Amino acid sequence: MQRAARPLVSVSDLDADKAAALKLIPIPSALEARLDAYVALLQQWQAKTNLVAPSTLPQLWTRHVADSLQLVSLMPHARRWLDFGSGGGFPGVVLACAMADVGGHVTLVERIAKKAAFLREALRVAGAPGTVILADIGDNVDRFPQALDCITARAVAPLHQLIGFAEPLMTPGTTKALFLKGQDVDAELTETTKYWKFQPKLHASVTGGQGWIVEIDHIERRT
């Protein structure tokens, strides 16, 4: 007799974490339903594909979903998003779920085929408006949308590299970048000033801890 696979995290733990996340960022019921579908699919795929660090699964909603969802409040009028290195879908799929009711669209860029397949399935299951591009970020800028409101990335590359990827796609006065960073943000900012002129704005993550969001709206390469 074949036994059902044991859940990666208990239902009660995940429900408690979800409640904590939605207390931080209240959302409409329709968006909650889309995120529920996405989270359920991620748990299924996580058993065979490493989409997020296993140690973070009990905090899936606070550590990943809410951390991603807070970007919407920083760019409430943004409709055209591009997410570098989407991986397990944070923040790309979460943003796409949020865009479903406002006519927005998210382009998700991922270089690993298995993860790109998951992202496509996640968008389908959640009913979220997005396109997945299987590509390496640095070599395929011409394949990405050119009219963008916001460019995002989370746990992908050092800040100075992310700015290098984003710079050709940013329209002054129109496009902003929101990069999620951790405790080393100050060191990354210092390193980035060696290569770029920019005036970053820092936002502390609503999820607490040592997370930061680096907001950038104008960059210029140093010569």
UniProtKB/Swiss-Prot annotation:
Binding site residues for S-adenosyl-L-methionine: G85, F90, R154
EC id: 2.1.1.170
Residue ranges of the TM segments: none
Record keywords: Cytoplasm, Methyltransferase, rRNA processing, S-adenosyl-L-methionine, Transferase
Molecular function, one GO term: rRNA (guanine-N7-)-methyltransferase activity
Organism domain of life: Bacteria
The keyword Transferase is assigned to this record: yes
Subcellular location: Cytoplasm
Broad class of where this protein is predominantly found: cytoplasm
Reaction(s) catalysed by this chain's protein: guanosine(527) in 16S rRNA + S-adenosyl-L-methionine = N(7)-methylguanosine(527) in 16S rRNA + S-adenosyl-L-homocysteine
InterPro entries (UniProt xref): rRNA_ssu_MeTfrase_G (IPR003682), SAM-dependent_MTases_sf (IPR029063)
GO CC annotation, single: cytosol
One Pfam short name: GidB
NCBIfam families the record matches: rsmG_gidB
Family label: Belongs to the methyltransferase superfamily. RNA methyltransferase RsmG family.
Biological role stated in the UniProt entry: Specifically methylates the N7 position of guanine in position 527 of 16S rRNA.
Protein name according to UniProt: Ribosomal RNA small subunit methyltransferase G
Name of encoding gene: rsmG
